[in-house]
Amino acid sequence: ARYSVVRWLPSETENAVGPHVHDPRSGEILDSDIQMYHNVMRLASAWYFIQSGPLNPRAAKLPLPDDILGKIVQFVVAHEVGHTLGFPHNMKASSMYETAKVRDKAWVKKMGHTPSIMDYSRFNYVAQPEDGIDPADLVPRVGPYDIWATAWGYKPIPGATTPAEERPVLDEWARQQEQTPWFRFMTSNARGADPGEITEAVGDADPVQATGLGVKNLARVMKMLLPATEKKGEDWENLEDMYGRVLGQWTREMLHVAGVVGGVDSHQKNGGQAGLLFTTIPAARQRKAVEFLSAQAFATPAYLVDPAILRRIEPDGVLARLRNAQSSVLESLLTPTRVQRMTEQEVLDGDKAYKPLDLLADLRRGIFTELAAPAPKIDAFRRNLQQTYLEAMHNRVNGGAAPPTHRWLYRGELKSLSGEIARALPRTSDRPTRLFLEDAKEQIARILDPKFAPPASPSLSLPLRRALEANGAESCWQELTITRDGIKLQ
């Protein structure tokens, strides 16, 4: 094309892309056209409200004011301009700032809350209202990594006339990453194992701390949701949509914590540089992540269950919504790749490792906490979660959700759980709890007996995991919404 332009497309698609055409011989960029699909504004506005609404009083009502929307458009276009210049995503960037720094208003004013606009780090959901962050600094901007990477890619090198002559200088510049961590890029071949390279994260140097702060803001957003979306004479469709997006944000943040389990810290190094590319995350950090999920994800998040909202959008459905959200977290913890990494960590790190058996025992204690009570009583939300757990185990023992080499783990865990249920049954006087536990014990017996085990059911979270791991330019702006019918990606 003769001109490189920003195109605004009349489309309901919630996305934007920045493709370019380049000469494969030289790398010269010949043409680029940023494509802004109209409904990317709906997506980005919803993210701003859900992630940073409690930090900006002017964002308490939807739609957002024009000047805030203008800042959001600037952010989206700048990210896509990066692609047109040849920059790939850098999911490592946001984890290079300590979590406390993204709450420091002086730091954020100077450095932003992420070093790179090419990260999938959206609006600052970690900062708290009392931190006093300037609302103008809640939106990502071109950061120190972007400036440094632009110089590395485009700054002339006097005297160099060939790529080979440029190489020593470029390598010297690249080594600045060793002293300045926010110049670092994603590690090659990390394969999703580094929680510092997760998407849609802020302050993910410590995902547990960041998510703990994030859910405080989500509780505030839930109180804002009804007045923000209510319009005289209109239905509650927008309220239902935003509530599903809030649950999606909650799910993403919990998945950030799940990424710590079986994870590694990675740092790109080449020949001649000391140190390892991959270092196992210490067992104490992994165990802390599971404890957090037991307390925050598997214990019912009461702030997400607001009758004033729920009775305006549907006659029933909250049990299914929360089950879908919690199921995605549980399934993420039990993926074959994660369990395999933990198995290899046990082999390589020995007693220092957080082992697969440790994970399963901690999950059992967190999901079936009531079994240890003097008089067990399990409510409907927790029965839903525990049934989800049994189905996940069934899919691993009798289905294709785990390789045969892992099956013994899940069979042993079900036997332990069956014993705990048997010991708890005489102590409960609550009829629903008794009936549920009796049924759960029978389910376990059928799962473990190949003569009676029914076919395993497909996991809703398998396609979710694949979609969330996609980080190509075509998926820069991907929303996760939790509905009563399942998980929607758009």
Where are these regions (language model features)?
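Metzincin-family zinc-dependent endopeptidase catalytic domain
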Residues: A1-T84, K109-H113, F123-V126, A284, ...
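Short linear motifs at secondary-structure transitions and domain/linker junctions
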Residues: V5-E12, M91-M96, T279
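Alpha-helix termini
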Residues: V40, A44, K92-S95, T99
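Conserved catalytic/binding loops enriched for acidic/polar residues
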Residues: S94-Q490
